[in-house]
């Protein structure tokens, strides 16, 4: 008997219990967040049972199908697909979310609406699980939109702040652009294949470029690729637990997961693979450059997320979706930990986010600073940490790929920049003399803060090794490789470390100077927000205002109604030119009446 699907249903049932509790009086008590956290931890433990059973079963996938409705000739069904991608991702997402929720018990303890906050976090997780386990486009779209609306609600959680509201609107608007591509793909598949079922789509394998372009636009919007990227750093206006969940295992990796899920359609289409490769390469380099000069600790980590998403896109572009999925899973651990460490630092330093006003935290907050270093080193791909097992494989695969040498060089440069801004983050926040106010009380003794970071630190060390052992090879791996190509990823990482340390030591003795154009380009995010959010709307609105004014003048004063009134006024002035001679007017009236009376008689 197959017990994988029943245990998966038990996992989902455990997660829905706190949602049902929100309709009872228990929702109004202070213990509700603890119930939600416990439910997620139990769900993670039960999810490990079907995960181990699946990995030991040597099966490709398990599919459950319940008929829902029939529309003309197309059947809609509630269909769940448990394969390697979905079952591993669900376990990783549950583990990371459990840690983030426990961290939120400490971080959000004073928020008056903490119960609603935890409910939103849980719904965020459930919608992502719907997305990754969906076996048809309609069900996938439900999870896709659910993730989008929950991100809008959570980014704008502190609705009293204008920046938070603006960031939430940015996120939802940029994602609407991606949704257009997704809906166009759904419409094309329905029109030409008469099916939204993934198995039927993969069996028919449409060769048209249009649906694949729609999927690429959808992924670019959701995963903040170049052109649709400005919402990701703006989303840092939300609470830190939201940033951790958004960047690790839910929203931003949904676009990459979509392309991983549809790789059977992309793998034999060189045009879409080249477009994906180039888009990912541009994204990973541009966002790495932007991260080099940022001073907000959360924005540095946010740009590192965008850079890693570009690297995942490059991996899909070289036709290695399993490696992209491995990087999604390994990235979730250290990225969530980095955000939680930054949240701990911000909380202790009285909401200070500027790394130039930190320093010396290795002595004041040794546990948080140590975990921040572990996460940063894992991000750079330091050997035998979690990031190494995916990032090094990706660089090796790119080295042996014949697709695009330009994209490979850009990716290597971005990898070096990753080491540079990670070193800068560690150097400014943890090392050197303290630069924060002396009266700040620093405390990192709360177990709700320490335990989740410890778990994620262990994941950042060991998870990559454990998950990489179960990655099924898509293509026969390279049997031989020159030593210089094997060590290229490590070489550029060490180069980035050395350059960053050298620059940090040199700049301590320099006098302030006017920033050069390259520095301004990086710190102002390539002028992209100013051009897209300020200059372009300004000229469009000015043009619209001028057109509206001209239309009003033409319609009101030249055609109607002012012109009609002017015509009537001119006619009345011509026909009756009044002079104010009342006696003459009265005499004319009497004469007229007398003549009329005589005619009648």
Curated annotation (Swiss-Prot):
Any one of the GO CC terms: mitochondrial inner membrane
Organism: Dasypus novemcinctus (Nine-banded armadillo)
GO BP terms in the entry: electron transport coupled proton transport; mitochondrial electron transport, NADH to ubiquinone; mitochondrial respiratory chain complex I assembly
Classification via InterPro entries: NADH_DH_su5_C, NADHpl_OxRdtase_5_subgr, ND/Mrp_TM, NU5C-like, Proton_antipo_N
Membrane recorded as keyword: yes
MF (Gene Ontology): NADH dehydrogenase (ubiquinone) activity
UniProt entry keywords in alphabetical sequence: Electron transport, Membrane, Mitochondrion, Mitochondrion inner membrane, NAD, Respiratory chain, Translocase, Transmembrane, Transmembrane helix, Transport, Ubiquinone
Top-rank EC class of the record's enzyme: translocase
Transmembrane segments: 3-23, 36-56, 84-104, 114-134, 140-160, 171-191, 201-221, 240-260, 272-292, 324-346, 365-385, 404-426, 456-476, 483-503, 581-601
Family the entry assigns: Belongs to the complex I subunit 5 family.
Function: Core subunit of the mitochondrial membrane respiratory chain NADH dehydrogenase (Complex I) that is believed to belong to the minimal assembly required for catalysis. Complex I functions in the transfer of electrons from NADH to the respiratory chain. The immediate electron acceptor for the enzyme is believed to be ubiquinone.
Family matches, as Pfam families: NADH5_C, Proton_antipo_M, Proton_antipo_N
Location within or outside the cell: Mitochondrion inner membrane
Entry protein name: NADH-ubiquinone oxidoreductase chain 5
Domain of life: Eukaryota
EC number: 7.1.1.2
Catalytic activity annotation: a ubiquinone + NADH + 5 H(+)(in) = a ubiquinol + NAD(+) + 4 H(+)(out)
NCBIfam families with a match to the protein in the record: NDH_I_L
Topology relative to the membrane: Multi-pass membrane protein
The keyword 4Fe-4S is annotated on this UniProt entry: no
């Amino acid at each position: 008997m197959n017990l994988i699907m029943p245990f998966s249903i038990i996992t989902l049932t455990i997660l829905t219990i706190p949602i049902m509790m929100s309709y009872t009086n228990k929702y109004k008590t202070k213990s509700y967040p603890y119930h939600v956290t416990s439910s997620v931890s139990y769900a993670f433990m039960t999810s490990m049972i079907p995960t181990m059973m699946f990995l030991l079963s040597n099966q490709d996938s398990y599919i459950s199908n319940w008929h829902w409705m029939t529309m003309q000739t197309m059947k809609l069904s509630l269909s769940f697909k448990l394969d390697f991608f979905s079952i591993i991702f669900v376990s990783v997402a549950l583990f990371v979310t459990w840690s983030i929720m426990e961290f939120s018990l400490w971080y959000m303890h004073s928020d008056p609406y903490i119960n609603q906050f935890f409910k939103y976090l849980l719904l965020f997780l459930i919608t992502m699980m719907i997305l990754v386990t969906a076996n048809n486009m309609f069900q996938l779209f439900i999870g896709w939109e659910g993730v989008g609306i929950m991100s809008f609600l959570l980014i704008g959680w502190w609705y009293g702040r204008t920046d938070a509201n603006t960031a939430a609107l940015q996120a939802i608007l940029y994602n609407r652009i991606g949704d257009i591509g997704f809906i166009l793909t759904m419409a094309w598949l329905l029109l030409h294949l008469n099916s939204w079922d993934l198995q039927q789509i993969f069996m028919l394998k449409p060769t048209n470029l249009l649906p694949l372009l729609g999927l690429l636009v959808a992924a670019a919007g959701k995963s903040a690729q170049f052109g649709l990227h400005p919402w990701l750093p703006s989303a840092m206006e939300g609470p830190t637990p939201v940033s951790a969940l958004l960047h690790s295992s839910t929203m931003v990796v949904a676009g990459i997961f979509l392309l991983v899920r549809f790789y059977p359609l992309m793998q034999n289409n060189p045009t879409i693979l080249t477009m994906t490769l180039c888009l990912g390469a541009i994204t990973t380099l541009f966002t790495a450059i932007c991260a080099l000069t940022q001073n907000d600790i959360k924005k540095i980590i946010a740009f590192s997320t965008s850079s890693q998403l570009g690297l995942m896109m490059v991996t899909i572009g070289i036709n290695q979706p399993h490696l992209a999925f491995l990087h999604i899973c390994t990235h979730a651990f250290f990225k969530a930990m980095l955000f939680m460490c930054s949240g701990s630092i911000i909380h202790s330093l009285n909401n200070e986010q500027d790394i130039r006003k930190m320093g010396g935290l290795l002595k004041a907050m040794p546990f948080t600073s140590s975990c921040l270093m572990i996460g940063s080193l894992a991000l750079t791909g330091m050997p035998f940490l979690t990031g190494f097992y995916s990032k090094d494989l990706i660089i090796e695969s790119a080295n042996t790929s014949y697709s695009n040498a330009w994209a490979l060089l850009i990716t290597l440069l971005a990898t070096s920049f990753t080491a540079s801004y990670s070193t800068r983050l560690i150097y400014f926040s943890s090392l050197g003399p303290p630069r924060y106010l002396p009266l700040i009380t620093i405390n990192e003794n709360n177990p709700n803060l320490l335990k989740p970071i410890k778990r994620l630190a262990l994941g950042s060390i060991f998870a990559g090794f454990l998950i990489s052992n179960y990655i099924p090879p898509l293509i026969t791996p390279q049997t031989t490789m020159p030593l210089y190509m094997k060590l290229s990823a490590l070489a550029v990482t060490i180069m980035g470390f050395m350059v960053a340390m050298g620059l940090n030591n040199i700049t301590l003795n320099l006098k302030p100077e006017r920033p050069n154009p390259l520095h301004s380009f990086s710190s102002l995010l390539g002028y992209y927000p100013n051009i897209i959010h300020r200059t372009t709307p300004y000229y469009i609105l000015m043009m619209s205002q001028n057109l509206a004014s001209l239309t009003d003048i033409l319609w009101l004063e030249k055609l109607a109604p002012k012109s009609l009134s002017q015509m009537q006024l001119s006619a009345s002035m011509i026909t009756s030119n009044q002079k104010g001679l009342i006696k003459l007017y009265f005499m004319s009236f009497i004469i007229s009446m007398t003549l009329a009376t005589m005619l009648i008689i």
